[in-house]
Amino acid sequence: MGFHQISVIIVVLALASARAADEFPSHTDTPTDCPEADHGCWCHGSFAQCWRTYEDSRMTEEIGNRITQLELLYQPSEEVVTYIRRISALRELRISEDGMSLDCSCDVIYALDDKQVTLVNQAELTFGNCRERGWPRERMAARPFVHRCHVLRMQDGETRKRRGADDNDGDDVSKRASPRKGDEPAGHKLKDLAPQNTHHLVNIHDADKHPASEFVNFISGHRRSRRSTDDDAAVSDDSERGARKKRYGNQGNYPQAMNPQSRGVNYGQPAQQGYGAQGMGGAFGGGQGMGGAVRGGQGMGGAVGGGQFGAFSPGEAEADNADYDEYSDSLDEGDTTISAAVMDDIKAVLGATKIDLPVDINDPYDLGLLLRHLRHHSNLLANIGDPAVREQVLSAMQEEEEEEEEDAANGVRQNVLNNINANAPGNAGYGGQGGMGAFGGGGGGMGAIGGGGGAMMGQQGMGGVPQRMGGQPQGNAYNQGYRQG
């Protein structure tokens, strides 16, 4: 080979080198597993070197699965993230700042963390345009920037956890405190509540039967069965009031239970608030002989079979006792006992509230307490997913609320009347005890001001009905618990 040929080869190589220097950023060798140089990537030592966007480089999935080390030139932050996420086998990354500065975007750091890729030139790398993204400086070195991005990510994670916990606990019934005694009930009045579509807190085990239906049937069915009779006018609601009175004694103006052996006789008690003592009932008659401070006492029972001016007539006493016995017998049958599974469902509806569970479901007072507690937490009813079941519970609670309001109003009125009677003139009263006769009823005393409503004189020994003076007995129209003439 002559000198001339050697010179031509040198010139060609020099031109090729100059062209390559203009077209490519650096020198490279070309192993078979490297991308093609004319697509914007080639191999530079052990690194694959790319200077075009991911789409323009025509990086195939097969080549991307073989590249473990990558160097990116002149790429913005968005393209750096794309390369990191698209090349599955990548383990090390070198980012060159030649001709371009990376923006202060933590997305690059988050992508490196997610793919477990190491930034090998972290010590000499810097990020720019930081003030535009809310950082205190215009440029930041890579190490402190990476550290701050890690701190921000941990803080964001904690914030998301707290927000998620707040969203999950926003309607958690276990975080609601039970209202203190005397506070207004939470939420709206029951009559203003409307069914709502909410999540179930009670699991539906059967498509045709809600697990709370047994509890609802007990509330709206058995306990209110006396309200559902054909003749409501002939049925008294006093058995339930009597059950509540039985727990607390004779308070709240509830009637006393009659003595069936004496045909509804109320035996004498010490005089209170200016009234005379109650008359002693006879063996067959019954009634109260009271000398009232303002009103006259009620007449004693007359002939055999009992008088008609007592607190209750014998027929009413028998009817009341029969209803009470029927109620007690139905409780003994065992068909109203709530099972443990249903009690668990009730607890699930109530949540971890402060009611003392388990209550005695067969005790009307305890059941009323449960209903009142549900009313104070009326928003818990929205967690009953079945609209029909929710309406039944709302109806039962509404009846309980109306009944309590009626009892409270009657108690206030009765207390007012008692105070008027106690403070009226003639407070001592002239009424004495009615006599006790074997057959005839004793006469009631005349009041100091009002006319006596009882019999002044009975037909002794004849068993006749006592004659009355001073008109009809003065009844108490406000207290429905007493059945007066």
From Swiss-Prot:
Residues 172-192 have a biased composition (Basic and acidic residues). Residues 250-264, 476-485 have a biased composition (Polar residues). Keywords: Cell adhesion, Cleavage on pair of basic residues, Cytoplasmic vesicle, Fertilization, Signal. Residues 157-195, 219-273, 305-331, 459-485 are annotated as: Disordered. Pfam families: Bindin (PF02084). Residues 317-331 have a biased composition (Acidic residues). The keyword Chloroplast does not apply. GO terms for cellular component: acrosomal lumen. Residues 21-247 form a propeptide. It is found in: Cytoplasmic vesicle, Secretory vesicle, Acrosome lumen. Its main location: cytoplasm. Residues 1-20 form the signal peptide. Residues 371-379 are annotated as: Fucose-binding domain. It comes from the Eukaryota. GO terms for biological process: cell adhesion; fusion of sperm to egg plasma membrane involved in single fertilization. Residues 465-475 have a biased composition (Low complexity). Species-specific sea urchin sperm protein required for adhesion of sperm to the egg surface during fertilization. Bindin coats the acrosomal process after it is externalized by the acrosome reaction. It binds to sulfated, fucose-containing polysaccharides on the vitelline layer receptor proteoglycans which cover the egg plasma membrane. Belongs to the bindin family. This is Bindin.
